[in-house]
Amino acid sequence: MTNRIQRLKNALFQNNREISLERALLYTASHQQTEGEPVILRRAKATAYILEHVEISIRDEELIAGNRTVKPRAGIMSPEMDPYWLLKELEQFPTRPQDRFDISEEDKHRYRDVLYPYWEKRSMKDFINGQMTDEVKAAVSTQIFSINQTDKGQGHIIIDYPRLLNHGLGELVAQMRAHCLQQPDNHFYQAALLLLEASQNHILRYAMLAEKMAESCPDAQRRQELLTIAENSRHNAQSKPQTFWQACQLFWYMNIILQYESNASSLSLGRFDQYMLPFYQASLTQGEDPAFLQEILESLWVKCNDIVLLRSTSSARYFAGFPTGYTALLGGLTENGRSAVNVLSFLCLDAYQNVQLPQPNLGVRTNALIDTPFLMKTAQTIRLGTGIPQIFNDEVVVPAFLNRGVSLEDARDYAVVGCVELSIPGRTYGLHDIAMFNLLKVMEICLHENEGNRTLTYDDLLAHIRAKISHYITLMVEGSNICDIGHRDWAPVPLLSSFISDCLDKGCDITDGGARYNFSGVQGIGIANLSDSLHALNGLVFEQQRLSFDELLLVLKDNFATPEGEKVRARLINRFEKYGNDIDDVDNISAELLRHYCKEVEKYQNPRGGQFTPGSYTVSAHVPLGSVVGATPDGRFAGEQLADGGLSPMLGQDMQGPTAVLKSVSKLDNTLLSNGTLLNVKFTPATLEGEAGLRKLADFLRAFTQLKLQHIQFNVVNADTLREAQQRPQDFTGLVVRVAGYSAFFVELSKEIQDDIIRRTAHQL
């Protein structure tokens, strides 16, 4: 890492995060002038107004220009989506437990006096709340399931970066003008053209700023860098990039512009090493220094950490530590089924090894064709201990997409949005994170509904749980579809849609069904606790008959608080096998109930004509979802977290080593979980030391691939180090750890999430 990159890193974290009202004020000012116009045009005009008037900056030593806010890592508001939580939490932002932001007194007053009065009763949240039935609201309130994306842009998508980079904005504008001439009454085409042209002008603003800064710059090298930034910007405003620097610059400009349009998380990067390779090769051919090209890439990696999402306090518990979702996948397969690993795949990992920040959230695609050098480079990067890269298995994901009607060529081109959500770049609007389903809460409801049932059998209880899962999935789908319609009617994204196939051919926004593939992705959470609980309950109550069903319920209601309750808890934990240890009796319960969940979810369609798709990953939601569930027969205390990850065993219950964990997860139908899965594994640093440790990790990754698991990620850190960081956070500001599908700075996480990571079983190989 060069001195420049180190200074750029340091500059991001010198000051506290702040909230900027600039986007919200500009958006509102435009919106007030467009009453009565079609929503999609109002949205486009508001975004164009932002692009014209927002303050821009080029920071010291930057090689990649483009900042969403002048101050680093500032949060922005979108009151047009939901003004209510912002008003409620204005005073809490600087002191809340997770994801703190400073906000000035002046901005508090401006929000209360200007922004909130305008958006009250005219936001997307008002529409969604007005459409939700009481039954759906009750299920959300008790956290049987959550409906996400009701207060901000949807995101969770990958635009067609090859189209942007290989054609350039000038050609795309010309194409959109032709569409407008052919269909002059089509509001989508009008909105998209307006924003493509506004994007060109926004980029030209940076060209003019760079030229102005160069005029007064006393340092000759920096002056030339600014002039090159200006030249690159002027070129990118009209033409397709010719160099790696230009390609990275246009790529980042579009990321920033799309942030202004929707203020959404997980506008992900796709297969970066594939579409950027021609530009990297062109620069090498032109005689560019490879070391400088790596510095360009590292500059871009640093920039990815400048964007953080302002979430509500409750949302920050579900998505703790700013999982921005700048996710990029490396390697994988070509459309012909050959290995896609290239020189840029290696360089992306080299650049990450130098930068070591939470973003981009790199992943590596493994398959039977992966070569040893790239597998070893991957293992070497994992061993650094930041949780990056995560691993995805082509041997599972490609068939999973084929099962959803995706073509073979498209399935081989898959990438990941957000944390682990599977998507086809440039062709999918997957609504990937629309809901989370609390499987353990459903079990708890069923247990209490059977209190006093003297004829209850274990099979009866299983049938009741399956039926209840089906019932609440119906309600979850109802709520998700209302949110889907809310985004269609209140928050279309015409600029983003212009980079998604087949929106241009259909002449409509992604929110209106314009994409080629239309899914709605929902997560089933708590399968490990559910299977552990049912296995122990069956053994204790129905097979051994040590307690009656009602007696066990009483122990659970008392939260194991009595001396007898403590003995029962010890027996539940120690005498009954747990998921994650390669024991069929309990693993098969997980497989059967998770399959039931998946098959129920996939029965339903969304308003865009697409299918609901199941996944199993938690982000950090296993903590808040566990807080609403009482004591359970796996020995969990009331309010204790659920198993992390999605498919991970419960904390401390995976006692037979990491290979046994792989075998347990392999018994689940990973192919059905086409919205993504998540498996966390923690290793001690000592077990991966030296060349031998590296080869053991590489062999473990090959076993993961052969066993046909979908996903795995790693923490490589000592619990003692993490405890020290809790005590002396000022000495560990750069410590990056894996949470669930993303990495974050350990000291920026709340204590409940920190404790969760510390308690995860540390394995040896």
Language model: regions and residue ranges:
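Small-side-chain structural scaffolding
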Residues: 207-210, 214, 230, 531
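Conserved catalytic cores of very large enzyme subunits
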Residues: 2-189, 225-765
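A conserved hydrophobic secondary-structure block that centers on an alpha-helix together
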Residues: 214-217, 221
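Extended amphipathic alpha-helical scaffold segments
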Residues: 203-211, 273-277
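Extended non-globular scaffold/tether segments
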Residues: 190-201
